[in-house]
Design a protein with these regions (language model features):
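Extracellular glycan-modifying ectodomains
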Residues: 1-111
Length: 111
């Protein structure tokens, strides 16, 4: 038995136009992007990660899509709260949204 390893899969990239617009004119209440296209963009990588986890008992995969997306959309902002600082970085609110699910897979308690 080895050391437990958690692979943190990529999260859906934010929409550049939407994020830029919110910086110029202020945040919109709710913004999202198409979940199917975002999942397709990273399908090859997620398949590789899940195959790795299936091959090794000590490896598990944390999938941010399970928190940030539903079947149709990936949320960029909800009720005026921005989940991204730019297309590639989560905001503090976005990170805090992922925290409970990450804590669960890591087996730690959030204080």
């Amino acid at each position: 038995a080895g050391v437990p390893v958690v692979v943190i899969s990529s999260y859906p990239a934010g929409d550049a136009d939407s994020i830029s617009r919110s910086l110029v004119i202020g945040p919109d209440d709710n913004r999202s992007t198409d979940a199917a296209s975002k999942r397709e963009d990273r399908a090859w990588l997620f398949e590789l990660e899940t195959e790795l986890a299936a091959e090794y008992d000590e490896v598990s995969v944390f999938d941010p899509y399970e928190v940030l997306c539903d079947q149709s959309v990936c949320r960029i902002a909800v009720d005026g709260t921005e989940y991204y600082t730019d297309t590639n970085h989560l905001s503090k609110a976005g990170s805090l949204l992922l925290a409970p699910a990450m804590a669960e897979i890591l087996g730690v308690e959030i204080r």
